[in-house]
Amino acid sequence: MTDVLVVLKVFPDSDEVNLDNLYTDISSKLPKEYKIIRKETEPIAFGLNALILYVQMPEQTEGGTDNLEEVVNNIQGVSHAEVVGITRLGF
């Protein structure tokens, strides 16, 4: 079974949200077969930054990336999360 790499942009609900704590919350609530490979921050506007997560997950996940977005969107401090890219890993 092949995995995919999902690029997920997470928007905090305010500029007071600590992105390191948000990352910790997200990584602890992801299903065990999901793995965060890399994290970055991206300036949005007026001192607000988005968290960019590169998440490795099984390709044959039921519902595709919807489950990932749902889990992250239900975390306190998240305004919303959206998939901005996806690529298949391996052959």
From Swiss-Prot:
Pfam family example for this protein? EF1_GNE
SUPFAM superfamilies given in the database record: eEF-1beta-like
Matching InterPro entries, A to Z?
eEF-1beta-like_sf, EF1B_bsu/dsu_GNE, Transl_elong_EF1B/ribsomal_bS6, Transl_elong_EF1B_B_arc
Tagged with keyword rRNA-binding = no
Give a yes or no for keyword Protein biosynthesis in this entry. Answer: yes
MF-aspect GO terms: translation elongation factor activity
Which keywords does UniProt give here? Answer: Elongation factor, Protein biosynthesis
Q: What CDD domains does the entry give? A: EF1B
Which Gene3D superfamilies does this chain map to? Answer: 3.30.70.60
Signal peptide feature range: none
Per the similarity annotation, which family is this?
A: Belongs to the EF-1-beta/EF-1-delta family.
NCBIfam families named among the record's database cross-references:
aEF-1_beta, PRK00435.1
Q: What does this protein do?
A: Promotes the exchange of GDP for GTP in EF-1-alpha/GDP, thus allowing the regeneration of EF-1-alpha/GTP that could then be used to form the ternary complex EF-1-alpha/GTP/AAtRNA.
Q: How does it assemble?
A: Homodimer.
Q: Can you name this protein?
A: Elongation factor 1-beta
Per UniProt, what is the name of the gene that codes for the protein in this document? ef1b
